Amino acid sequence: MKQLLDFLPLVVFFVFYKMYDIFVASGALIVATLLALAFTWFKYRKVEKMTLVTAIMVLVFGTLTLAFHSDLFIKWKVTVLYVLFAVALLVSQWFMKKPLIQRMLGKELTLPDTVWSTLNMSWAVFFLVCGLLNIYVAFWLPQDIWVNFKVFGLTALTLVFTLISGVYIYRHMPEEQKKS
């Protein structure tokens, strides 16, 4: 349910873009994000940090897009968000006792420290690559292609990378955890 709520504003953005334009879609994205955030808070009494950061980025970059009537801001939001995620992962890798991925999943999974480090670095690189891909698609290709890439391309890449990470985790899980 939470994943659907996180994905819903993106669907709203896509639909409003196809029906109207990037500016109406950006406004709809802001509203949908705020509604999803409010619903999440009232239903679960908790909002994940990544969800909150994403919502703040949508509010800031969406508002700038509307205020300056420039699609540059909403296009940059994707890259800035991915770079922030990558930086958070890298900072946790280099300056904290546990990588961020381990702090997020470590209660459910028992894995060797090297596996946590590899996962953490892999996701950091993934986010950096996605941020760079977004720059290329957003600024060198037509807006329609960028919207499709943002909604379908990045979502598909994230899903595939999540599955690859799941396989990697499974291969390194203790046997007793694999059975449960």
Curated annotation (Swiss-Prot):
UniProt keywords, alphabetically: Cell inner membrane, Cell membrane, Membrane, Transmembrane, Transmembrane helix
Keyword Membrane: yes
GO-annotated cellular components: plasma membrane
Location within or outside the cell: Cell inner membrane
Principal location class: membrane
tRNA processing listed as a keyword: no
Topology term for the membrane: Multi-pass membrane protein
Pfam family, one: IspA
Disulfide feature: none
Membrane-spanning intervals of the chain: 22-42, 50-70, 72-92, 121-141, 149-169
Domain of life of the organism encoding this protein: Bacteria
Record InterPro entries: YciB
Family: Belongs to the YciB family.
HAMAP family given in the database record: YciB
Function as written in the Swiss-Prot or TrEMBL entry: Plays a role in cell envelope biogenesis, maintenance of cell envelope integrity and membrane homeostasis.
Protein name in the entry: Inner membrane-spanning protein YciB
Organism lineage string: Bacteria, Pseudomonadati, Pseudomonadota, Gammaproteobacteria, Enterobacterales
